[in-house]
Regions:
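Acidic, metal/ion-coordinating pockets
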Residues: 2-385
Length: 385
């Protein structure tokens, strides 16, 4: 016989309900913790995939009250020193009417196109400064028509590598041979220099180069004869450069009488006019020989550096040349007047009986002789002034 089932009391029912509720609460709590843990893991993965890796660039230092940064960097009014080197006539080529086994082109072929051959002896000097400037005299072109004149010089466009291989950064084209092959040759020369990173300038083309944060203006002028018109073009360019914010203005002039060791009155008049107009330095070439120098209003005028890497003559009678170097101190728009200059004696050739087209620094007795020669020329200028 089966026992009769009994009915649960209210107390038992209440206990069962409490137990069920507690179990449900525990389950929800465990589920919430698991979900939170999963959410954190997902957030870390997303952050790792979207946040870029830190760079080595430090945060910019905060500016201090004195116009300086907290790191100690000065404002632009701090003095900046820069060294600029100048060399003379670079005729990288030959007149086709005088081509022979001793010509510049023949030397290029003998060196199998090694552009470093020509300026090898001065490359270290040029590489140690902040800017090197030469006179590029002749056309670098395969085209154009030869001018009807006694000497017209042309070289291959690739000859521009001769300059760039020795840290020559700029070249004036204001001279009597840059247009020996017309406008085509002139334009090709500019393009050839541009391709090698050599800044050309001259006539109405004023070049502006940034050297250690200093805006330098390079002005090239050609004086086929002493004239007020040439002087005005030069001084107008100087004024324009100043208006453009140039801090240092350099003028490279092609002037004077060929093969004359003494300057003309016109050279001095024009050179001093350039200084009066605001130039900080005037250097010159064209006579094919070195001339003297003077200081006017605290600025240097170096009248002729002579030839340099000169393909215009297989054996020049006078192989002496000069490299001029000046270190400028620029503070804002002010250029200090100083005598931090160097007149470096050199020769256009490593041989005395022929032109090797490889300028070399003079040493020993040769250096002393050239130094004395330049000083004597400077003394004559001073005596006549």
């Amino acid at each position: 016989m089966y026992a009769k089932p009994t009915c649960p009391t209210p107390l038992k029912i209440l206990l069962v309900v409490v137990i069920v509720v507690e179990l449900a609460a525990i389950g929800l709590l465990l589920a919430g913790r698991a979900g939170a843990s999963e959410g954190r893991d997902s957030a870390v993965e997303a952050s790792a995939s979207t946040t870029p890796a830190p760079t080595d660039t430090p945060a910019a230092p905060a500016a201090s009250d004195g116009g300086e940064t907290a790191g100690g960097d000065k404002a632009s009014s701090e003095p900046v020193t820069l060294t600029v080197t100048f060399a003379g006539d670079c005729t990288l080529g030959t007149d086709i009417n005088y081509e022979n086994e001793r010509s510049f082109n023949s030397r290029w072929q003998a060196e199998e196109g090694d552009a470093t051959y020509f300026l090898r002896n001065v490359a270290d000097l040029f590489g140690s400064d902040d800017l090197t400037v030469v006179n590029m005299e002749g056309a670098l072109t395969e085209g154009g028509e030869r001018a009807d004149k006694k000497f017209a010089f042309r070289g291959k466009p690739e000859y521009a590598k001769i300059l760039s291989s020795a840290s020559v950064e700029a070249a004036t084209l204001a001279n009597n041979h840059s247009q020996d092959y017309g406008q085509t040759g002139y334009d090709d020369t500019i393009a050839a220099l541009d391709a090698e990173g050599v800044q050309s300038f001259g006539y109405d083309r004023v070049a502006y180069v940034d050297v250690k944060g200093v805006k330098v203006a390079l002005i090239g002028s050609y004086f086929p004869e002493d004239s007020a018109e040439n002087t005005k073009e030069m001084t107008d360019n100087i004024a324009a450069a100043r208006a453009e914010g140039a801090q240092l203005v350099i003028v490279y002039v092609h002037w004077g009488q060929e093969h004359e060791y003494d300057i003309t009155e016109g050279q001095q008049t024009a050179g001093r006019a350039a200084i009066d107009a605001g130039a900080d330095l005037v250097v010159g070439s064209h006579p094919h020989v070195v001339q003297g120098w003077e200081v006017y209003q605290g600025r240097y005028l170096v009248y002729s550096l002579g030839n340099f890497c000169f393909g215009g003559n297989t054996n020049p009678d006078d192989k002496d040349c000069l490299i001029f170097q000046q270190t400028f101190t620029v503070t804002g728009d002010e250029v200090a007047k100083n005598d931090d200059v160097d007149f470096i004696a050199a020769s256009v050739s490593t041989e005395t009986d022929r032109n090797t087209y490889q300028p070399v620094l003079a040493e020993g007795d040769e250096k002393a002789r050239i130094d004395a020669k330049v000083q004597e020329a400077a003394d004559r200028i001073a005596a006549a002034s």
